[in-house]
Protein backbone atom coordinates (compact mmCIF):
# COMPACT_ATOMS: atom_id res chain seq x y z
CA UNK A 1 0.00 0.00 0.00
CA UNK A 2 1.39 3.41 -0.95
CA UNK A 3 1.21 6.22 1.58
CA UNK A 4 0.70 9.57 -0.22
CA UNK A 5 3.59 12.01 0.03
CA UNK A 6 1.14 14.91 0.13
CA UNK A 7 0.29 14.16 3.77
CA UNK A 8 2.39 15.60 6.60
CA UNK A 9 4.83 13.03 8.02
CA UNK A 10 2.81 12.44 11.20
CA UNK A 11 -0.28 11.68 9.09
CA UNK A 12 1.75 9.39 6.81
CA UNK A 13 2.91 7.51 9.90
CA UNK A 14 -0.63 7.17 11.27
CA UNK A 15 -1.99 6.06 7.89
CA UNK A 16 0.72 3.39 7.67
CA UNK A 17 -0.18 2.15 11.16
CA UNK A 18 -3.87 2.07 10.21
CA UNK A 19 -3.14 0.24 6.94
CA UNK A 20 -1.10 -2.41 8.75
CA UNK A 21 -3.89 -2.78 11.32
CA UNK A 22 -6.28 -3.33 8.41
CA UNK A 23 -4.06 -6.10 7.03
CA UNK A 24 -1.45 -4.45 4.79
CA UNK A 25 1.68 -6.57 4.71
CA UNK A 26 3.97 -3.89 3.28
CA UNK A 27 4.02 -0.10 2.96
CA UNK A 28 5.49 2.02 0.17
CA UNK A 29 6.64 5.59 0.63
CA UNK A 30 6.80 8.11 -2.18
CA UNK A 31 8.20 11.53 -2.88
CA UNK A 32 6.18 12.55 -5.89
CA UNK A 33 6.76 15.94 -7.42
CA UNK A 34 7.09 17.72 -4.09
CA UNK A 35 10.86 17.45 -4.24
CA UNK A 36 12.35 20.00 -6.59
CA UNK A 37 16.07 20.11 -5.92
CA UNK A 38 17.65 23.51 -5.68
CA UNK A 39 21.20 22.23 -5.98
CA UNK A 40 23.04 20.48 -8.80
CA UNK A 41 24.87 17.18 -8.58
CA UNK A 42 24.90 14.89 -5.57
CA UNK A 43 23.29 17.43 -3.27
CA UNK A 44 20.39 17.80 -5.71
CA UNK A 45 19.92 14.03 -5.83
CA UNK A 46 19.68 13.97 -2.03
CA UNK A 47 17.25 16.90 -2.00
CA UNK A 48 15.04 15.15 -4.58
CA UNK A 49 14.87 11.94 -2.53
CA UNK A 50 14.46 13.59 0.87
CA UNK A 51 10.62 13.32 1.10
CA UNK A 52 10.57 9.56 0.51
CA UNK A 53 13.65 9.04 2.70
CA UNK A 54 12.04 10.95 5.57
CA UNK A 55 8.83 8.95 5.21
CA UNK A 56 10.75 5.66 5.13
CA UNK A 57 12.58 6.66 8.31
CA UNK A 58 9.41 7.56 10.21
CA UNK A 59 7.20 4.74 8.93
CA UNK A 60 9.76 1.93 9.24
CA UNK A 61 10.04 2.70 12.95
CA UNK A 62 6.26 2.71 13.42
CA UNK A 63 5.23 -0.53 11.70
CA UNK A 64 6.38 -4.15 11.81
CA UNK A 65 6.05 -4.81 8.06
CA UNK A 66 8.56 -4.13 5.27
CA UNK A 67 8.71 -0.55 4.00
CA UNK A 68 9.52 0.06 0.34
CA UNK A 69 11.09 3.44 -0.40
CA UNK A 70 10.29 4.80 -3.88
CA UNK A 71 10.31 8.04 -5.89
CA UNK A 72 13.31 10.07 -6.87
CA UNK A 73 15.91 7.52 -5.83
CA UNK A 74 19.31 7.14 -7.47
CA UNK A 75 22.56 5.25 -6.93
CA UNK A 76 23.51 8.06 -4.54
CA UNK A 77 20.38 7.75 -2.41
CA UNK A 78 19.73 3.97 -2.39
CA UNK A 79 22.14 3.46 0.53
CA UNK A 80 20.37 6.32 2.34
CA UNK A 81 17.05 4.52 1.85
CA UNK A 82 18.50 1.40 3.47
CA UNK A 83 19.92 3.47 6.31
CA UNK A 84 16.50 5.11 6.77
CA UNK A 85 14.96 1.70 7.37
CA UNK A 86 13.67 0.69 3.96
CA UNK A 87 13.51 -3.05 3.34
CA UNK A 88 13.48 -2.43 -0.40
CA UNK A 89 13.52 0.32 -3.01
CA UNK A 90 11.51 1.24 -6.08
CA UNK A 91 13.43 2.74 -8.99
CA UNK A 92 11.01 2.46 -11.91
CA UNK A 93 11.39 5.95 -13.37
CA UNK A 94 15.18 5.81 -13.08
CA UNK A 95 15.01 3.02 -15.64
CA UNK A 96 11.75 3.57 -17.54
CA UNK A 97 12.68 7.07 -18.67
CA UNK A 98 15.53 5.63 -20.73
CA UNK A 99 14.90 4.49 -24.30
CA UNK A 100 18.11 2.53 -24.79
CA UNK A 101 18.24 -0.99 -23.34
CA UNK A 102 22.00 -0.77 -22.78
CA UNK A 103 21.51 2.40 -20.76
CA UNK A 104 18.82 0.62 -18.73
CA UNK A 105 21.20 -2.26 -17.99
CA UNK A 106 23.93 0.20 -17.00
CA UNK A 107 21.58 2.00 -14.60
CA UNK A 108 20.42 -1.27 -13.02
CA UNK A 109 24.04 -2.35 -12.56
CA UNK A 110 24.91 1.00 -11.02
CA UNK A 111 21.98 0.72 -8.62
CA UNK A 112 22.97 -2.84 -7.73
CA UNK A 113 26.55 -1.74 -7.12
CA UNK A 114 25.36 1.11 -4.89
CA UNK A 115 23.45 -1.36 -2.73
CA UNK A 116 26.26 -3.92 -2.78
CA UNK A 117 28.77 -1.34 -1.55
CA UNK A 118 26.70 -0.86 1.59
CA UNK A 119 25.84 -4.52 2.09
CA UNK A 120 28.45 -6.74 0.41
CA UNK A 121 26.14 -9.74 0.05
CA UNK A 122 26.06 -11.10 -3.51
CA UNK A 123 22.99 -9.74 -5.32
Each language-model region and where it sits:
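Alpha/beta enzyme core
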Residues: 1-69, 74-123
Amino acid sequence: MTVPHTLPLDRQEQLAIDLVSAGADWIQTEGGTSANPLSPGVQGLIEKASPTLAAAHVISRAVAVPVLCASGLSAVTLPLAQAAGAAGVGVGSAINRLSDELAMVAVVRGLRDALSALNPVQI
